[in-house]
């Protein structure tokens, strides 16, 4: 009865829901005014009352091969460059020119356990400004934003961001009629403007306009009052109410993540990328069917091994036959120990007669490399989806290393068992020791790899060892090859 309870507990642990709360923290801006920090499972958003801006988007979740990073342009490590404009700063034109209003009220309201609405508002001198951000705990870098302006103004600019300069600066990309355009689209080439932002190899900072630009507004790029380059929306004249509905993506530059945000056109996939995305979509299908990425990877592994089964079984047979030929091989080595050329000819003839491939033992492992590489890249490029999914057994996040190294120990143990099964029926020979050392060395060198990759290799090792046991059982009745 106790064993049944234990198995049920393990099964339920695979569906433990991940933390989805949004954390709120009140802080102070560098000028000593009110600030608000909102943290979901991937990023930390900082809002300042100074100018009512989104001051920082810090990606603190850093999957394997990446680092925590700031997305909002204008920051140099933890310092804001002098004169830089921050997102959604409003700059008045004409009379009263300047950044105005300069001090907003900040209010945060929870919309259930999984979402927070941040509201930045100001009212005075005939103008009312309200900026609303909707941050969900399990959002994949996408934040719906609404900017509402009402009153009278002789022109204003809604600054969407600072434009970095230099050789390593991100490129400016616009979306026009669903197609990416490098830089700012020319007036005559403009169609429906659907977004604009900054794209580099690691991150994307992008403002998406699902409904297009509000009537009477247009894109602009120029400099702010401090002479720093900026881009945003120009409102030539405000009379009445203007509502800007946008969605802000500030996150990693990954195709699947951008695809979920409706921004997949920002990336062009090569042939390998298409295969990788296919694997990710297959894993997502399995995840939807099972409710857990752990089971999705297990099913993916089984499917991969079924596809490779004919070749794998043939090569394991070849490897087993090679081991059974060891008495004959050792006899030839003894006979021609002083004549290596003749020895090689005799060995080649022996392999040909017995229909054995001397390299067959390596092929089952080499066949796994395409699947391992595809799965590794799939996990790397969709790590956020794994991170937001439920934990699997004792592993909290399959996109990160196993914190307890249990899956590594289990995999190494299964490989050592397979080594024992393959060696116990053949005479001891030189070089057998490497077969015992390699699994341990492999586990040590790649201990920091994602747990999802180790889960694949663990299931593969079980299947491989089981196939070896079956093949050796089939051949066990034939006995070792005679040396004579």
Regions found by a protein language model. Give the residues of each.
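Conserved acidic functional residues
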Residues: 2, 113-116, 368
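N-terminal, polar/Ser/Thr-rich
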Residues: 22-28
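Soluble non-transmembrane domains of integral membrane proteins
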Residues: 28-30, 36-264
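Helix-loop-helix
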Residues: 7, 14, 18-21, 47, ...
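A generic structural signal for solvent-exposed, polar alpha-helical segments
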Residues: 12, 53, 81, 106, ...
